[in-house]
Amino acid sequence: MKPHFRNTVERMYRGTFFYNFNNRPILSRRNTVWLCYEVKTRGPSMPTWGAKIFRGQLYPEAKDHPEMKFLHWFRKWRQLHRDQEYEVTWYVSWSPCTRCANSVATFLAEDPKVTLTIFVARLYYFWKPDYQEALRILCQKRGGPHATMKIMNYNEFQHCWNEFVDGQGKPFKPRKNLPKHYTLLHATLGELLRHVMDPGTFTSNFNNKPWVSGQRETYLCYKVERSHNDTWVLLNQHRGFLRNQAPDRHGFPKGRHAELCFLDLIPFWKLDDQQYRVTCFTSWSPCFSCAQKMAKFISKKKHVSLCIFAARIYDDQGRRQEGLRTLHRDGAKIAVMXYSEFKHCWDTFVDHQGRPFQPWDGLDEHSQALSGRLRAILQNQGN
């Protein structure tokens, strides 16, 4: 039996979609929340029997929020369909507020036959600790039911355009900064939910053998510390990892290196004028262009010091050597990762599930050899 839908919208106007699903991280005057949803029965064919839109306001009572409207409707309908398993997907213009996140977490705990994936265009009050904690509770994986939350990227915006927008036959045209904003929001959500790296991803990409093949990605793990009473205090809210963005005709046509994604992220933190130390652990040392831009950043931000530990040196010939020298000359500390840095990354950024770091054969020897090469590069100021 098909469900009876109330308080829903069949399709939204194109202007409504572009205005409300703008993924610019900081926006004002977006007080209406749009929630597009799909409900599928879990099984081999997984037919979609519900695909509609709820709309609500940010500031009235929580019962007026679209998440609460959906839960009210779905709970009533589920009373007649308790035995069926469902997969629910939301596409929302704002991530849930604290009360909605708590209500959704309670709903999932009460109804383990329902799985929920939430794609969000923007993060609501992501800098407030109570909002951060509510989303962590909603998405925690401690063996119980939880939601999966992701940032909308091109494919999700395209899907919403096709399924929920009265496009009048016109194709979806993404905003120019959609991929850059996605990268910022994706990294911020990773910080907020404390995402960790798969162990295989870490050991494959951070292996410090001097010659490797097939590893085109760069991973960058980072942490931020603030000076307080002559000691460095770790800021847990600014800790995570990034990787380079592959070339994408819908996003970055030429791709975007992890270091540049990281530089995009730092202003988003809105650091004050106190002294900060930023430490990066990278699978490859920066290329010439990235090194130059990182050097420009620290030369302008005198209150931010930068430490870079690289697992390997990226093609250290010619201009790339000069890029590292410029970065070093402008005040960055550059070093090769040794056992202690690999172990720290494993303990801090990897989903190790209690397993200790196991060094691979030749780790120390490779680290010593790479350190010698790096010293030669940095000391060769005349070339």
Curated annotation (Swiss-Prot):
The modification Phosphothreonine is found at residues 32, 218. GO terms for biological process: cytidine deamination; cytidine to uridine editing; defense response to virus; DNA cytosine deamination; innate immune response; negative regulation of single stranded viral RNA replication via double stranded DNA intermediate; transposable element silencing. SUPFAM superfamilies: Cytidine deaminase-like (SSF53927). GO terms for cellular component: cytoplasm; nucleus; P-body; ribonucleoprotein complex. It comes from the Eukaryota. It catalyses: a 2'-deoxycytidine in single-stranded DNA + H2O + H(+) = a 2'-deoxyuridine in single-stranded DNA + NH4(+). Residues 213-215, 312-319 are annotated as: Interaction with DNA. It is an enzyme of class 3 (hydrolase). GO terms for molecular function: cytidine deaminase activity; RNA binding; zinc ion binding. Residues 1-60 are annotated as: Essential for cytoplasmic localization. The keyword Disulfide bond does not apply. Residues 29-138, 214-327 form the CMP/dCMP-type deaminase domain. Its main location: cytoplasm. The record marks 244 as: Interaction with DNA. Zn(2+) 1 binds at residues 65, 97, 100. Residues 209-335 are annotated as: Necessary for homooligomerization. Belongs to the cytidine and deoxycytidylate deaminase family. The CMP/dCMP deaminase domain 1 mediates RNA binding, RNA-dependent oligomerization and virion incorporation whereas the CMP/dCMP deaminase domain 2 confers deoxycytidine deaminase activity and substrate sequence specificity. Homodimer. Homooligomer. Can bind RNA to form ribonucleoprotein complexes of high-molecular-mass (HMM) or low-molecular-mass (LMM). HMM is inactive and heterogeneous in protein composition because of binding nonselectively to cellular RNAs, which in turn are associated with variety of cellular proteins. The LMM form which is enzymatically active has few or no RNAs associated. Its ability to form homooligomer is distinct from its ability to assemble into HMM. Interacts with APOBEC3B, APOBEC3F, MOV10, AGO2, EIF4E, EIF4ENIF1, DCP2 and DDX6 in an RNA-dependent manner. This is DNA dC->dU-editing enzyme APOBEC-3G. It comes from Erythrocebus patas.
